[in-house]
């Protein structure tokens, strides 16, 4: 395995939660080849088109930002396949990755989920834990495998 400062990753994330992970990876001198985030959406009273916090950060740091509407889009897949990456890091992205994307890195695809699985699977685990007055919560780090319902937990 390469040393940390020689690693190259593809990062998939959208939220403020995922941005904290992205910033930490960047601070460790891990090369971020590209960022994949949800497409900009109109919101608010004026229906202004807003980009995600991850998208904004990527642009400020001159990292390629991709916003595919379809994870099976040929142009998107060709782009990410051409980039030699060691890992995919997925943190609160908002879409399920295809088998093809999961298998792109030389090593692994790793998913970070903001709950102690299986308690709050799916979207908004932090909000659901708060609304349920959970006394204990955490983060799970797992391998992303072909069958998303059967992750292999690396850490909790």
Q: What kind of feature is each model-predicted range?
A:
Residues 1-149, 153:
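One-carbon transfer enzymes
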């Amino acid at each position: 395995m390469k040393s940390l400062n020689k690693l190259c990753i593809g990062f998939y994330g959208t939220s403020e939660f995922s941005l904290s992970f992205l910033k930490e990876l960047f601070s460790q001198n891990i090369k971020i080849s590209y960022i994949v985030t949800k497409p900009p959406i109109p919101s608010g009273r004026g229906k202004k088109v807003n980009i995600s916090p991850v998208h904004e950060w990527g642009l400020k740091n001159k990292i390629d930002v991709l916003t595919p509407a379809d994870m099976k889009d040929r142009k998107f897949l060709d782009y990410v396949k051409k980039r030699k990456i060691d890992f995919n890091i997925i943190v609160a992205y908002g879409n399920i990755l295809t088998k093809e994307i999961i298998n792109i890195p030389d090593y692994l695809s790793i998913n970070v989920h903001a709950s102690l699985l299986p308690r709050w699977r799916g979207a908004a685990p932090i909000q659901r834990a708060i609304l349920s007055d959970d006394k204990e919560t955490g983060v799970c780090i797992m391998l992303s495998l072909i069958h998303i319902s059967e992750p292999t937990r690396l850490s909790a």
